[in-house]
């Protein structure tokens, strides 16, 4: 009777519990596919585990943070008024303003004037003549429009700029004369340009107004004589011979109305022995022979036409 009574079925979770909690595992377990459905949580955990796992020989990954943009802030001084520095101030001054400032400083400090004189470069012939031409331009621009430019009225109108030109001429001329100027070519070049400026001085109807012009010719003539004498002492006057100064001085004498005749005579006396027999009274035939020999020596043709004796003397 008892064998026919059916035993109640055991719930499945009892089997699961007994399988996982068995103290004696089987020596040869048989892997069978589990019929239990996998949950989504299990899949996520397995995926995270596989992704987080890394080989033992791979370098560790260290996260890097992106550089944050740096902000540069330039410090600005407080805005307030201040005077210009000396270099910037000098940049704003023109030539006339600089001359005025330098002149006033030299007048107040004589020691500074000596330093400026020794520090400044030596004026050249070009720069000196340019200054004289600037005064000449100012003189020409001072003439009144219309009327007689040779009248006393015109003379009174241009008297001040005329005096400025003559004063500048008197100051610059001694600078280019010996012994202050040792190069005869420099002195002659200046005198040539200065004489041209004197030729351009206006002529007046009144003789008394022409006294200043005549005095300028007398001073420049004395300067010509001094330079010619010094140039004749150096190198046999070669600067006078090959510079064409005899022709230039003759032209200046003609334009001045004969007021440079003393300089022309001095040049003739200094170069008389260098000219040939066809010179304008500068030399004798003997001096012409000396000049011919000198020309042959300078050209390298001396003695080429002389016959050479062969055999016993």
Swiss-Prot record:
Protein name listed in UniProt: Tethering factor for nuclear proteasome sts1
Biological process, per Gene Ontology: nuclear protein quality control by the ubiquitin-proteasome system; proteasome localization; protein transport
Transport recorded as keyword: yes
Species: Aspergillus clavatus (strain ATCC 1007 / CBS 513.65 / DSM 816 / NCTC 3887 / NRRL 1 / QM 1276 / 107)
Taxonomic superkingdom: Eukaryota
Subcellular location: Cytoplasm; Nucleus
Biased composition (Polar residues): 20-33
Region (Disordered): 1-79
One Pfam entry name: Cut8
Molecular function per GO: proteasome binding
Record note on quaternary structure: Binds the proteasome.
InterPro entries: Cut8/Sts1_fam (IPR013868), Cut8/Sts1_sf (IPR038422)
Any one Gene Ontology cellular component term annotated for this protein: nuclear membrane
Function statement: Involved in ubiquitin-mediated protein degradation. Regulatory factor in the ubiquitin/proteasome pathway that controls the turnover of proteasome substrates. Targets proteasomes to the nucleus and facilitates the degradation of nuclear proteins.
PANTHER family, per database record: FI02826P (PTHR28032:SF1)
Compositionally biased residues, Basic and acidic residues: 39-50
Protein family according to the UniProt entry: Belongs to the cut8/STS1 family.
Entry keywords, A to Z: Cytoplasm, Nucleus, Protein transport, Transport
């Amino acid at each position: 009777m008892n064998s026919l009574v059916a035993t109640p079925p055991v719930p499945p979770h009892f089997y699961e519990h007994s399988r996982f909690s068995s103290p004696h595992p089987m020596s040869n377990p048989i892997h069978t596919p589990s019929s239990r459905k996998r949950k989504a949580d299990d899949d996520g955990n397995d995926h995270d585990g596989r992704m987080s796992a890394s080989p033992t020989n791979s370098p560790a990954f260290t996260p890097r943070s992106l550089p944050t943009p740096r902000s540069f802030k330039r410090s600005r001084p407080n805005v307030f008024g201040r005077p210009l520095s000396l270099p910037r101030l000098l940049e704003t001054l023109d030539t006339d303003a600089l001359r005025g400032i330098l002149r006033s400083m030299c007048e107040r400090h004589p020691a500074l004037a000596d330093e400026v004189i020794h520090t400044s470069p030596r004026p050249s012939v070009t720069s000196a003549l340019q200054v004289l031409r600037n005064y000449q331009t100012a003189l020409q621009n001072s003439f009144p429009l219309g009327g007689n430019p040779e009248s006393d009225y015109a003379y009174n109108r241009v008297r001040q700029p005329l005096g400025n030109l003559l004063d500048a001429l008197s100051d610059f001329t001694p600078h280019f004369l010996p012994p202050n100027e040792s190069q005869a070519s420099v002195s002659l070049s200046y005198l040539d340009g200065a004489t041209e400026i004197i030729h351009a001085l206006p002529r007046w109807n009144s003789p008394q107004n022409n006294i200043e012009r005549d005095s300028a010719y007398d001073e420049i003539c004395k300067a010509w004589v001094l330079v010619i004498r010094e140039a004749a002492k150096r190198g046999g006057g070669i600067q006078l011979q090959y510079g064409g100064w005899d022709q230039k001085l003759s032209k200046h004498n003609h334009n001045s109305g004969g007021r440079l005749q003393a300089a022309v005579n001095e040049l003739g006396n200094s170069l008389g022995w260098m000219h040939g027999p066809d010179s304008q009274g500068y030399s004798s035939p003997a001096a012409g022979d000396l000049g011919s020999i000198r020309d042959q020596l300078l050209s390298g043709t001396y003695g080429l036409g002389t016959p050479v004796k062969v055999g016993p003397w």
